[in-house]
């Protein structure tokens, strides 16, 4: 039982850590490519900015899904019921 809970805690840490790391890398690439595009064609900067914010919103959804899965494993672990029964 304790092993299952400790592995769940490790899994939660990995899920949250990798989701945060992936999002940070994604935002860095997105910002860099936006600046490249805006520097190359300054007249396209407003349209690129709108698209960048849309993609940033979609990119931000990934760690939110990871946090929800981590909260599921933290507070309502589905594997504990199989162990008890």
From Swiss-Prot:
GO cellular component terms given for this protein: plasma membrane; proton-transporting ATP synthase complex; proton-transporting two-sector ATPase complex, proton-transporting domain
Protein topology in the membrane: Multi-pass membrane protein
Localisation: Cell inner membrane
Site (Reversibly protonated during proton transport): 60
CDD domains xrefs: ATP-synt_Fo_c_ATPE
Coiled coil: none
Family (UniProt): Belongs to the ATPase C chain family.
Alphabetical keyword list: ATP synthesis, Cell inner membrane, Cell membrane, CF(0), Hydrogen ion transport, Ion transport, Lipid-binding, Membrane, Transmembrane, Transmembrane helix, Transport
Transmembrane segments: 10-30, 53-73
Signal peptide residues on this chain, from the entry's feature table: none
Task of the protein: F(1)F(0) ATP synthase produces ATP from ADP in the presence of a proton or sodium gradient. F-type ATPases consist of two structural domains, F(1) containing the extramembraneous catalytic core and F(0) containing the membrane proton channel, linked together by a central stalk and a peripheral stalk. During catalysis, ATP synthesis in the catalytic domain of F(1) is coupled via a rotary mechanism of the central stalk subunits to proton translocation. Key component of the F(0) channel; it plays a direct role in translocation across the membrane. A homomeric c-ring of between 10-14 subunits forms the central stalk rotor element with the F(1) delta and epsilon subunits.
Top-level taxon of the source organism: Bacteria
Record's subunit section: F-type ATPases have 2 components, F(1) - the catalytic core - and F(0) - the membrane proton channel. F(1) has five subunits: alpha(3), beta(3), gamma(1), delta(1), epsilon(1). F(0) has three main subunits: a(1), b(2) and c(10-14). The alpha and beta chains form an alternating ring which encloses part of the gamma chain. F(1) is attached to F(0) by a central stalk formed by the gamma and epsilon chains, while a peripheral stalk is formed by the delta and b chains.
Organism: Aliivibrio salmonicida (strain LFI1238) (Vibrio salmonicida (strain LFI1238))
One MF annotation (Gene Ontology) recorded for this entry: lipid binding
HAMAP family: ATP_synth_c_bact (MF_01396)
Annotated NCBIfam families: ATP_synt_c (TIGR01260), PRK06876.1 (NF005363)
Main localization of the protein described in the UniProt heading: membrane
Stated name of the protein: ATP synthase subunit c
Entry-linked SUPFAM superfamilies: F1F0 ATP synthase subunit C
This protein's encoding gene: atpE
């Amino acid at each position: 039982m304790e092993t299952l809970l400790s592995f769940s805690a490790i899994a939660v840490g990995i899920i949250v850590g990798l989701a945060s790391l992936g999002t940070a890398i994604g935002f860095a690439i997105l910002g860099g490519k936006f600046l490249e595009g805006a520097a190359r064609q300054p007249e396209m900067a407003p349209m690129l900015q709108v698209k960048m914010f849309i993609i940033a919103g979609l990119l931000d959804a990934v760690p939110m899904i990871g946090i929800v899965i981590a909260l599921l494993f933290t507070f309502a672990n589905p594997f504990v019921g199989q162990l008890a029964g």
